[in-house]
């Protein structure tokens, strides 16, 4: 999955699943299954339902993604 093969979208975590997987509802209403990126895991960034996140989706499978950023609460 190269940099040119990803779509970055913003969404909200709606459910925490086992093995660092999360169900994320994107701003357009779609629900995707997303895992935490390695850099977020390495830096111990905690995610809870309700957090706003940025998800990278592959153009080949739009139902799965990678959480790359947790937005700061406002």
Curated annotation (Swiss-Prot):
Domain of life: Bacteria
InterPro entries: NA-bd_OB-fold (IPR012340), RNA-binding_domain_S1_IF1 (IPR006196), S1_domain (IPR003029), TIF_IF1 (IPR004368)
Positions of the S1-like domain: 1-72
Keywords noted in UniProt: Cytoplasm, Initiation factor, Protein biosynthesis, RNA-binding, rRNA-binding
Compartments where located: Cytoplasm
Pfam families: eIF-1a (PF01176)
Family: Belongs to the IF-1 family.
Record NCBIfam families: infA
Family matches, as PANTHER family: TRANSLATION INITIATION FACTOR IF-1, CHLOROPLASTIC (PTHR33370:SF1)
Known partners and oligomeric status: Component of the 30S ribosomal translation pre-initiation complex which assembles on the 30S ribosome in the order IF-2 and IF-3, IF-1 and N-formylmethionyl-tRNA(fMet); mRNA recruitment can occur at any time during PIC assembly.
Name of this protein: Translation initiation factor IF-1
Species assigned in the record: Thermotoga petrophila (strain ATCC BAA-488 / DSM 13995 / JCM 10881 / RKU-1)
Gene that produces this protein: infA
């Amino acid at each position: 999955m190269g940099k040119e093969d990803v779509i970055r979208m913003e969404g909200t975590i709606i459910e925490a699943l086992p093995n660092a997987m999360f169900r994320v509802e994107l701003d357009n209403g779609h629900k995707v299954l997303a895992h935490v990126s390695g850099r977020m895991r390495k830096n111990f960034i905690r995610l809870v339902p309700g957090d706003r996140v940025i998800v990278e989706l592959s153009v080949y499978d739009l139902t799965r993604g990678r959480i790359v950023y947790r937005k700061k609460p406002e």
